[in-house]
């Protein structure tokens, strides 16, 4: 499938919120935090992210047939890739209220990720998502190449978290190594690192 990568722009906010919600609604962490098939909660989560949290480079994959976003990738350099754990209460008070009853799970989830974020310089990947009807057509690979090219230009290490076993193998193709695995809010999570010289 032919796609063109373009920097994310706010005029595509609603399109990217919908595509990310569709891409992640069946992911184990999202099901644990929000419940099964909660597109409404996933949309609220990604709307918050796109407006307030995903600071740094973000790109959309636009379908060459219709120009519509079919993929999204965000990455950000350490030490600004995740908030410090002590900043999470402020985020709850100012940004996360639309998530309602899911807030405690989201805080456990992101609190753990903030705690485990490596202290070594890196560029943190996430989210990366592809519309369900465009998966396994090369869109995710195109988005990953965008990220890897950034790592190589910046001579930087990469870091990511995933809640899908099949993604572990996908990321290994791009030079990522498994750092650790653990259960988090009732589901398995894998943490991966790509050395600067991969």
What are these model-derived regions, one by one?
Residues 141, 153-155, 164-181, 185-188:
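Conserved active-site alpha-helix within GNAT-family acetyltransferase domains
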């Amino acid at each position: 499938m032919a796609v063109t990568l373009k920097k994310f722009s706010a005029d595509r906010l609603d399109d990217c919120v919908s595509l990310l919600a569709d891409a992640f609604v069946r992911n184990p962490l999202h099901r644990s935090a929000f419940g099964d098939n909660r597109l409404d909660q996933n949309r609220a989560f990604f709307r918050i992210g796109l407006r307030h949290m995903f600071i740094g480079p973000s790109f959309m994959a636009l379908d060459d047939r219709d120009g519509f976003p079919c993929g999204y990738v965000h990455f950000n350099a350490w030490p600004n890739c995740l908030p410090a754990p002590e900043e999470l209460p402020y985020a709850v008070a100012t940004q996360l209220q639309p998530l309602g009853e899911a807030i405690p799970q989201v805080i456990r989830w992101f609190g753990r990720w903030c705690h485990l974020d490596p202290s070594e310089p890196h560029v943190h990947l996430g989210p990366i998502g592809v519309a369900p009807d465009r998966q396994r057509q090369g869109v995710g690979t195109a988005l990953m190449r965008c990220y890897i090219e950034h790592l190589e230009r910046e001579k930087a290490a990469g870091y990511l978290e995933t809640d899908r076993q099949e993604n572990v193998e996908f990321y290994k193709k791009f030079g990522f190594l498994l750092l650790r695995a653990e259960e988090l809010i009732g589901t398995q999570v894998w943490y991966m690192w790509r050395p600067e010289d991969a």
